[in-house]
A protein has these predicted regions:
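Short glycine-/small-residue motifs
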Residues: 124-127
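Amphipathic alpha-helical segments
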Residues: 19-34
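Vicinal oxygen chelate
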Residues: 1-11, 34-82, 89-118, 129-132
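Short phosphate-engaging motifs
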Residues: 22-23, 86, 90
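Conserved active-site tyrosine of GNAT-family acetyltransferases
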Residues: 23-27, 94, 122
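Long, hydrophobic N-terminal alpha-helical segment
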Residues: 13-17
Length: 132
């Protein structure tokens, strides 16, 4: 990492959602995150090293103009990944939270075992464990 380049540290990401209460409940329940800020159009939650801002999609155009905000059925353009030491334990927690796995657990060619799922707004999440 170049210490002179301040653009190498991602501090927060904004995810556009259609149902803010459902997204908030999902993130608190599945990820165990706490709410840092909340207003009628957004909820900011704190991961260990990142803030995720859940923002109503109807408000997102002010951030991305002149581009438009894609809907949940417009296709995946990114995936957020979390690396863990106990994928089986995470899978058990996801099952207890009624989270449907889209893939996995499966061994990937790059040496990780992974699962994927989506949040209520359709954002894709991958959880992976390094295989020894």
């Amino acid at each position: 990492m170049d210490p002179k380049n301040p653009l190498q540290k991602i501090s927060a990401i904004s995810l556009f959602v259609e149902d803010l209460p459902a997204a908030k409940a999902f993130y608190q329940s599945v990820f165990g995150v706490s709410v840092l800020f909340e207003d009628p159009t957004s909820v900011a939650v704190k991961f260990e090293n990142l803030i995720v801002n859940l923002l109503l999609a109807s408000e997102g155009s002010t951030l991305v103009h002149p581009a438009t905000v894609g809907g949940p059925d417009s296709g995946k353009r990114f995936q957020i990944s979390i690396w863990v030491d106990d994928l089986d334990g995470v899978c058990a927690k996801l099952a207890a939270e009624n989270v449907t796995l889209l893939t996995g657990p499966q061994l990937q060619p790059w040496g990780m075992k992974t699962v994927t799922f989506v949040d209520p707004a359709g954002h894709s999440w991958e959880v992976g464990q390094q295989v020894k």
